[in-house]
Amino acid sequence: MKKIKWLSGQPKVTSGVTWGMPWKKGELKKGDRLALMNENAETRYVQSEPSAYWPDGSIKWTKHAAVFGGQENQSFTVHKREVPQPTESLSILETEHDIQVDTGALVCTIHKTGSDFIQSLQINGKPIAAGGRLVAIRETRKESAAKMVLLHERSVSFIKRAAIEQSGPVKAVVKIEGVHVLHKTYEEWLPFVIRLTFYAGLSEIGLVHTQLIDRSGKLEFVKGLGIEFDLFLEGEPYNRHFRFAGEKGMYKEPAQLFGTRKFNERYPLYEKQINGEMLSPDEEHKEWFAHGTQNAVWDDVKIVQDSSDHYSLSKRTGKDYAWVGMLHGSRAKGLCYAGGKNGGVALGLRYFFEKYPSALEITGLAGSRPKMTIWLWPPDGEAMDLRHYTGNTHVASAYEGFDEMRSDPTGIANTNEISLACFSHMPSDEVLNALADKWQAPPLIVCEPDVYYESKALGVWSIIDTSHPLKKELEEQLDAAFLFYKKEVEQRRWYGFWHYGDVMHTYDPIRHMWRYDLGGYAWQNNELVPTLWLWQAFFRSGREDIFRMAEAMTRHTSETDSFHLGEYAGLGSRHNVVHWGCGCKEARISMAGLHKFYYYLTGDDRTGDLLTEVKDADYALVKTDPMRAFYEKGKHPTHARTGPDWAAFCSNWLAEWERTENSEYLKKIETGINCLKRLPLRLLSGPTFEYDPATSMLHHMGDGIAGGYHMIIAFGAPQVWMELAELLDDWEWEDMLSEFGEFYTLSDEEKRKKSGGALHDGHFHWPMFAAGMTAYAARKKQDPHLAAKAWNLLLEDKLSHTPLPIKPERIETWTQLEELPWVTTNTVSQWCLNVIAALELIGDSLPAKKETSGKKG
């Protein structure tokens, strides 16, 4: 039996939910049936499948789908038992040309080719919508001294492949892949991937849309990017209605307003019209109708979120007439509705203000075929600019990676979550508002922290324990670190289509500003793995705010900081002013271990794609050698450091092995480990090797050579390797990890002696980064002296680079700010990860209480 609960309260409206949960080794076998039980001991069907396996073949992670009514129970349990039949099932039928999904409340027919992915949407046997064509507007520029000419060309989607990925009975998923095609030249550009998700009994569709960039962005600019739906609405203009979700509720109007000079807001039917009641002319009100039908018909209406703090609503009577401003607001909830006598459609875009600019538009509302467009990048503002910020690399002055200019967006992606709901009647404001809230923060079922911890399915980390005074102090500091970044996202407005989810690298206390404009000090791009810190913080706490930040960071870093096609496919881009700007393209940024927990917790299929994408990322190093600035090509195809390169490969291979049980990826891990075992210094060798992806072999070049020993451990290698140690049953591998952790803390003299003179203090920078590995060594050796060294690395300010307490200062500059003058995301991420590990491994060896409540950090 497993206890599960809602991440943030039960949904207010009926919702389809997919979630994941871990299992102890041997606890769940293939073929075991699972059922869901609520607090009233009522059992229901849950669609279940494995998403990862233990080495013995038992199930490590499962993925589940179920439909929950509004005001559901707060908690549930999952049991191993015979599964009851689902009360509602969907059906799916595939033909040569289309795929039809019938949820019982909605019938959706999906094209397998052409421009529109939805052939029809039907409610109660009647069509309500169709289309679903993707729209991209290309901008090209011709500039002279006297003028600039902008050319805007419209392109629409062309479907290349549509396939059923899940077929029920509770949940169905259809994956669609294609490109945009320009009208005039038929040129293809901007590949896309869309998944449509359906749940039994629901008249909703979830869309996960991924836009890939296949151009450099130097000559062609994306002016607009959206998805357009056709509506089949019935009724007169005065019975056509729109709704937009503002900050608190719905703004609503009809296409033709019946407030007139003679019959104003005091007229009793006027309020009914505004509230969406259908009007029928009769003898009593015929004069009102006669006046009202002479009013302007407002055919087009849109809401544009042009910054994280401003949206505007406007309307016009047609494309040949001016837009009239309606209202302004701060942060819209990203939902619009258009409907008539026969019902209508609601569309929603998640992260509507966070990933500005964004827009929702209704055109031709009063006509025979209205359109609704969800703009991921609205054409109202500036075109998307993917160019680099400079013509130089600024390596020496600004911490850029290489002298080579490799700032290229080709291969990056951006994924967005869109929702669509169909109605056979006018929905109430309460229903639409509940939908808007649900679509912005989708309901999710999670486990209690002790379930994650006891499963041992997530590597090495500690459960929260405040029984010891210093443990309590450290938990307060871990919480303070997270809260600082949570507030900083809002304070610094780290929002935007290409930015949301990321944080900045290093702070400038003189300008009271992050180094947003200084080469490698700007966006973090997963450097020193803050994503791992956030996921471990969530597993320990179960907190929604931590989950949401980890989710946003995972979505951003896995898509925008990584490359999915082109020369750098499988790699990611190091920290820079522009997310794809650094000359370093590295496996450490895109490694599976940074993203797999989101996949396991949510069952997100797009993230599953990304884990598969990187399984053979080591081959990308043949074209982009990470050590090309230091070494010429040798006998073997490329070079790799044990960390971060080979450690990232291990992470990728582990994810592929546990997800698919493909033992070839286990062999790749074992091959590298065995290469290291044969060397006198084992894991301390190198750290740079010649590498052959065809054999997965590391070829020794020497010890203490270029590569940097702190680089081995700063990018998630300890977390990956300790997780592997739990799985491999290889005592020598465990001993190698222990040896590395102990060696980092030795004196210079001891390092030279133990390595035969090859290694010394000059090779081992940033010892705090090794605190977790040192704690691992202390635990394995039962060595209190080593444990004391590890804690000293974390608690002594000069070594930890994290002055305690973490207590922001309030200052007055161009505005009032809270700041940590010393802060870098590198050190905070690593300090938190190493503290979390040390609390697990040597939590019983804590020193006397350290005072962290007086001085400012």
UniProtKB/Swiss-Prot annotation:
Domain of life, source organism: Bacteria
One Pfam family this sequence matches: PcRGLX_1st
InterPro entries referenced in this protein's UniProt entry, alphabetically: PcRGLX/YetA-like (IPR045793), PcRGLX/YetA_2nd (IPR048330), PcRGLX/YetA_3rd (IPR048331), PcRGLX_1st (IPR048329)
Cystine pairs: none
Protein name (record): Uncharacterized protein YetA
Species of provenance: Bacillus subtilis (strain 168)
Protein encoded by which gene: yetA
